[in-house]
Amino acid sequence: MAEPLPRHLLIPFAGRGSPACRAALATLRLPNLETLLLRLTLADTDTQDDSTRSPPHERALARALGLPPADDGCIPWAALEARKTGLAAPGDPEAWGLVTLCNWQVGIDDVALGDPSAIEIDAAESMALLAVAQPFFEEDGIALYPSDTPGRWLARAPIFDGLATASIDRAVGYPISQWSPLGDASRPLRRLQNEMQMLLYTQRVNDERTARGVPPINSFWLSGTGVLKDGDLPSPPLSRTPVVELALRDAALRDDGLAWAAAWQALDAGAVAGLLADLTRGADVALSLCGDRGAQLFTVQPRGLARWAKGLFDRNRATQVLESL
């Protein structure tokens, strides 16, 4: 019988380089995380810069799932979802992408991406807009399908093969121009975005949203592009899926240092404490801490007496680890 896989907790935005969150880091008191880091061993480090389209937590999740290495911005999240839901058959060579409805926030000097998770779209609105959008996408050879998440569609087209796109978690709050795909291959997509902006402006759905006091949906963001080959699919599917804890995300993206620190305290008392309890009971556990620039994976490994003794005096380790992310 195969050995059980470790319980793996993956925490995006565990470290954050934005001013308020970075200042809040010094105030954190995370006793359960401190104890976990004393008892676990650093097994893997992934450090890049914060200009990568694929953020550290997405790269860490792809590794944990057993997906093969991909070029920056080309982790095939959409193709993986299409395969799991049955939209893509085994052996399907087509490329897929995630189309996420969003609010582009128009400023004096630039247009920034608002967080799609804040637009409060329901399934009926998502399906109504999908029906309107499909003919426009089809003109460019892109087939659109609904997903289980309102406001997010699966798109299938050859244009997505090798097209690097930025994760929403990279782009939120920043100028669209900073993270939009460039080059000749993306020109049809930029034109399609312009067409969709004009189309969405006239939709009854947005009139009703305005009456409710929620942000209008005025564009879409493309991400998760790529091809999933048969040999790339984890086997068995989902067997190595870590628990992805998103409690820190919203505060981190807003650079709300107080809320981020409060979320960390609650996380330490909740999911982190639970992982520590599992470890204490003898379970095989793993912890991935991810920030803007890097991710670190901690696992259960045999430790010699010297390393154990050193750990007893390394009481600032949690803050140091989070700061390094």
Question: What spans do the regions from the language model cover?
Answer:
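An N-terminal, globular interaction/scaffold subdomain
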Residues: 22-119, 123-126
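Internal, conserved structured core segments that host functional sites
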Residues: 121, 153-160
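C-terminal regions of proteins
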Residues: 257-325
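Flexible loop/turn segments at secondary-structure boundaries
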Residues: 16-19, 217-218, 226-230, 293-298
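Acidic carboxylate-rich catalytic motifs and surrounding loops in phosphoryl-/glycosyl-chemistry enzymes
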Residues: 145-152, 221-222, 287-291
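Extended, Lys/Arg-enriched charged tracts that mediate electrostatic binding to polyanionic substrates
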Residues: 118-146, 202-219
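N-terminal basic/disordered segments at the start of proteins
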Residues: 2-24
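A contiguous, surface-oriented mixed alpha/beta subdomain in the mid-to-C-terminal portion of proteins
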Residues: 148-150, 159-280
